[in-house]
Amino acid sequence: LQLVFFDQEEQNLQGSLAFTLDPLNLDHLLGVIVLDMVGYRCDQPGCQAYPRGLPIAPPSDRGDFLAVVGTLEHPNLLNAFKASPLTYTLPVPFKGLLTPDVLRSDHAPFWFYGIDAVLVTDTGNLRNPHYHRPSDRSGTIDPVFFAEAAQTVVDALLALQF
């Protein structure tokens, strides 16, 4: 188990790209769980937007779930999250090439190297009005939702069978 923090995601995924370019980092790597924006919840109707071209129907117009995005080609990690009532799992075909909005985070370089990777997210700018703004501060994080997100990842890790 490695805990890795990637930098410069907003600058064309530079941190995760640099990591994947070193073959030693990928040797014996069984999977990657990327957490990106996991602490914002909104319960008001209409507060949740979705990217175009999703292969399945969105669950609701409320932002009270975690999206877990993975590929159809590598379902192991994605399946580990399905048991959680907090998650909405999104299997994406063709490594996201038909839905480029799902390629905006650090999981994407791993997909292109054929490594099972998932993005766990509150959907960022599709829900959070503070995303990348001066008002994006720790006080906007829902501490209960954030703790539930952390527990969801722990539960998924325990459910994994490699």
Q: Regions from the language model: what does each represent?
A:
Residues L1-E73:
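Acidic/histidine-rich catalytic neighborhood of metal-dependent amide-processing enzymes
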Residues D43-F162:
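Active-site-adjacent substrate-binding region
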